[in-house]
């Protein structure tokens, strides 16, 4: 009873403070820290990893929710080691991790009291979020928590345009009950696991084709988060310009402003920190036949192009069902880490350089230095800056294996 009263009071206070969001000093400091880190690793892991067909397998194959839920009784990631994950990611030069606490399949990867459909009811029986939180805090890696607004399993979730073949009874939809469920889960995550640096939402687009606009009641939910942890950032992968209460702007599979994948055509709002999320291979969740990994040079150039837009790169890996990270993904992390140890000063703590020449030269800058990144296949013979200044690279005309950098004092 006391827990219920406390939650209701917290939500009431959050509702009252949802209007005219003003970030706290702690939140503004978190925004700067986030932007300075520039590189994070996304981890999509849930029951779907066992099917090895990607994170949307449940809805793509129209699997009945009750039948799908039985897979939890076989989930036993006996080789999972949170400290090893975090160590590998830190060695890669990443400053934060974003982990899927609950994806669209509705399975919770922590010890939640709000549903029996969670990691503690599996043969594994250990709180994955707890282990990751402890490892991140020990190794000074920021922890961001992905949370889906969609649930293909719960009948109280008002179905949108996905998950329609999972056998839920649509007559049982109950938005107030589902909204309360989500807020209770978010309260658990923000009160039981120490410092959480960002809540990363996904799924708003599930109702973007409704004839009557769907009210997700986001301002109140965002206010709840900020009340529980004022420094915690809020981001939402809704593919729209930021809504009130959000602290970062997210772009899916695209560098801000480019929209080549067709998911991120929203206007870039430079008043907030920016983040691009992208896959290391093709899928977000583990797919056994997806070996289409991007080369290390491609990933490094993506990081450079993203930083040159003043944005962070959130690079995804889909862990395997046994709890290990794929060998190729680990190799790419090591290769990126090697490059960042030599060149991280041109990425970390920088902002958009403002100088772009064609497709082959982009830039970052700090207080007194402009870093010209030559990312074309060949190093140019000379570079003319907008100011008229001409620079002749000492390796002009040579093959460019990755990223040739020229530092220009301002």
Which positions does each model-derived feature cover?
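Positively charged n-region of N-terminal signal peptides that target proteins for export
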Residues: 1-4, 89
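Non-catalytic RNA-recognition surface used by pseudouridine synthases
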Residues: 7
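Hydrophobic h-region of N-terminal signal peptides that target proteins for export
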Residues: 10-18
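Mature catalytic domains of secreted/periplasmic carbohydrate-active enzymes
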Residues: 19-410
């Amino acid at each position: 009873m006391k827990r219920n009263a406390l939650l209701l009071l917290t939500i009431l206070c959050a509702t009252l403070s949802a209007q005219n969001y003003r970030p706290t000093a702690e939140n503004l400091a978190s925004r700067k820290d986030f932007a300075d880190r520039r590189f994070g690793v996304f981890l999509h892991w849930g029951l779907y990893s066992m099917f090895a067909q990607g994170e949307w397998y449940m809805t793509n194959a129209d699997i009945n929710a009750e039948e799908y839920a039985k897979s939890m009784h076989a989930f036993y990631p006996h080789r999972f080691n949170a400290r090893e994950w975090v160590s590998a990611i830190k060695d890669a030069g990443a400053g934060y991790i974003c982990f899927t606490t609950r994806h669209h399949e509705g399975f919770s990867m922590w010890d939640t009291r709000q549903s029996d459909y969670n990691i503690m009811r599996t043969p594994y029986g250990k709180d994955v979020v707890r282990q990751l939180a402890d490892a991140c805090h020990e190794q000074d890696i920021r922890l961001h928590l992905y949370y889906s607004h969609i649930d293909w399993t719960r009948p109280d979730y008002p179905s949108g345009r996905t998950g329609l073949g999972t056998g839920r009874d649509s007559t049982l939809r109950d938005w107030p009950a589902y909204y309360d469920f989500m807020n209770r889960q978010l309260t658990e995550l923000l009160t039981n696991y120490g410092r959480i640096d960002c809540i990363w939402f996904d799924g708003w687009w599930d109702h973007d084709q409704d004839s009557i606009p769907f009210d997700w009641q986001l301002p109140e939910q965002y206010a709840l988060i900020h009340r529980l942890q004022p420094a915690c950032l809020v981001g939402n992968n809704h593919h729209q310009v930021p809504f009130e209460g959000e602290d970062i702007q997210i772009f899916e599979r695209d560098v801000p402003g480019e929209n080549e994948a067709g998911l991120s055509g929203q206007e870039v709002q430079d008043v907030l920190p920016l983040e691009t999320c992208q896959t290391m291979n093709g899928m977000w969740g583990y797919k056994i036949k997806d070996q289409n990994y991007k080369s290390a040079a491609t990933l490094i150039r993506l990081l450079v192009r993203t930083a040159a837009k003043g944005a962070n790169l959130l690079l995804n890996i889909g862990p395997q069902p046994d709890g290990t990270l794929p060998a190729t993904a680990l190799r790419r992390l090591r290769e990126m880490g090697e490059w960042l140890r030599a060149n991280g000063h041109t990425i970390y703590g920088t902002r958009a350089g403002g100088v772009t020449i064609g497709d082959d030269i982009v830039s970052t800058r700090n207080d007194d230095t402009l870093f010209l990144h030559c990312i074309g296949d060949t190093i140019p013979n000379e570079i003319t800056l907008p100011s008229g200044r001409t620079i002749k690279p000492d390796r002009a005309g040579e093959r460019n294996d990755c990223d040739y950098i020229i530092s220009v004092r301002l």
